Design a protein with these regions (language model features):
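Histidine-rich, glycine-flanked metal-binding segment
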Residues: 1-2, 8-48, 185
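Active-site microenvironment of metallo-dependent hydrolases
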Residues: 1-19, 24, 352-436
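Histidine-centered catalytic micro-motifs
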Residues: 48-60, 222-231
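Active-site gating loops and adjacent loop-to-helix segments of metal-dependent hydrolytic enzymes
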Residues: 61-94, 120-129, 156-176, 231-256, ...
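Histidine/acidic-residue-rich catalytic or RNA/ligand-binding cores of hydrolases
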Residues: 64, 231-243, 271-276, 293-302, ...
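Alpha-helical scaffold segments that flank or form the walls of functional sites
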Residues: 64-146, 177-190, 426-435
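Metal-coordinating catalytic core of metallo-dependent amide/deamination hydrolases
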Residues: 122-262
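His/Asp/Glu-enriched, well-ordered alpha-helical/loop segment
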Residues: 251-258, 300-382, 398-399, 408
């Protein structure tokens, strides 16, 4: 048993002082606010572990390299494909490990990896058909982060169009072949990893193939899908099927309480209602959505309809859980010219317990007895946090990833403040990808 003494901690929906937390076999066994007994000190404000519900690890190699020209999501996508064409299982492992280490240093303790980079550049499977997925599982393990590998079905480059170029790496050819490959992943998982599934998007999964997800939805498996990130996708879907992407998913049994609609940016009122009635998660990725010029999604309307907000860093233009949380509120302010749409407590729930639950880790995201022992401590005396009140508002509206001093995942200390080492590892591997 290990006991930690938390100077301040977010417990039971509020900040408490001098909280003693006992940990045994990776679980929290005791939580004692206003404690008089001692423990390993964690000075600052300690939060439950944060969840990154949408990641494409290899996109991290694009940061700072896509800002030179005007363009759109679609022109950015061509640059992303260039990186996708350079990776093999070994380089993918190295890049993902460094990216996940950056997440850990930012306070993330779980990640949902939306994985579609499956095969060799010409589309031929590796001898081990899951070599790339195995690389991601190993990278997460070695970086110290829990992972839900969301193995992704990708069959078309657009409505009715075959994959072309690097997209051939993404496709298994048929939904049946994809399901067969995914089924072989289960033996590779452990206590810190799960397998979920994803439909890349309605443009990349033909309508008849969407039915492959209904059994996963019925079984409560995490099912994620890019949804209505772009206006063009909506228009193309209506032209092809006569309905919006959300309605198409609903009609084919893809929506349910363990479904995550990623982005959910350009929705009709009926779309919001359908997602809410399904009690689906809405995985917003504000830093990526603003980087790509996607737009601002209806976060509050979705929550009020019954959906549950979670947060991801997606393309990793920024890896900062605190920035993602506050960006939801800040974007709403820009869109409405009014303040106060989300409380700090609501945004912390989105960033912690609700996010973990959407990834299949319903026993993470709270500092409570029986929960996984995930603790994230932030400095309360940094230039960003000093003088801010030392409570949940400090975490959501002032702190940044650079303020994280300690991270514990499943009772194991995985980060102790060396942000410099994280940067050096990223610089090394990304440099070799661009200049082999």
């Amino acid at each position: 048993m290990t006991a930690y003494l938390l100077e301040r901690a977010w417990v039971g929906g509020r900040v408490r002082d001098t909280v003693r937390v006992e940990v045994e076999h990776g679980r929290i066994t005791s939580v004692e606010p206003d404690a008089t007994r001692t423990g390993v000190p964690l000075r600052g404000l300690t939060l439950p572990g944060l969840a990154n519900t949408h990641s494409h690890a290899f996109h991290r190699a694009l940061r700072g390299r896509t800002q030179t020209d005007r363009g759109t999501f679609w022109t950015w996508r061509e640059q992303m494909y260039a990186v996708a064409g350079r990776l093999d299982p070994d380089t993918y492992y190295e890049l993902a490990k460094a990216t996940y280490a950056e997440m850990v240093a930012a306070g993330y303790t779980s990640v949902g990896e939306f994985h579609y980079l499956h095969h060799q550049p010409d589309g031929t499977p590796y001898d081990d058909a899951n070599a790339m997925g195995s690389a991601l599982l190993a990278a997460a393990r070695d970086a110290g982060i829990r992972i839900t590998l969301l193995d992704t079905l990708y069959l078309s480059s657009g409505f009715g169009a075959a994959p072309e170029g690097v997209q051939r790496r993404f496709s298994d050819g048929t939904a049946e072949s994809w399901h067969e490959r995914v089924s072989a992943l289960a033996p590779l998982t452990g206590a810190a990893s799960l397998i979920g599934v994803a439909a890349h998007s309605v443009r990349a999964v033909p309508a008849d193939a969407l039915e492959a997800f209904a059994p996963y939805v019925e079984d409560g498996v995490p099912v994620h899908v890019h949804l209505s990130e772009q206006v063009k996708e909506n228009a193309d879907c209506v032209a092809a099927h006569g309905v919006t992407p959300t309605r198409l998913l609903a009609d084919h049994g893809v929506l349910g309480p363990m479904t995550s609609a990623v982005h959910a940016t350009h929705l009709t009122d009926e779309d919001v209602r359908l997602l809410g009635e399904a009690r689906a998660f809405a995985s917003f990725c504000p830093t990526t959505e603003r980087d790509l010029g996607d737009g601002i999604g209806p976060a509050r309307a979705l929550q009020e309809a019954g959906s549950v907000l979670t947060l991801g860093s997606d393309s990793h233009a920024v890896i900062d859980a605190f920035e993602e949380m506050r960006a939801v509120e800040m974007d709403e302010r820009l869109a409405t010219q009014a303040r106060g749409h989300w409380t700090a407590a609501e945004l912390l729930a989105a960033g912690t317990a609700d996010g973990h639950r959407s990834l299949g880790f319903g026993d993470a995201g709270e500092i409570a007895v029986g929960q996984r022992a995930d603790l994230v401590t932030i400095d309360l005396a940094s230039p960003r946090t000093a003088g801010t009140g030392r409570d949940e508002h400090t975490a959501v509206f002032a702190a940044g990833a650079a303020d994280v001093t300690h991270v514990i995942v499943d009772g194991v200390v995985v980060f102790e403040g060396d942000h410099g080492q994280v940067g050096r590892a990223l610089d090394d591997v990304i440099g070799r990808i661009w200049n082999p």
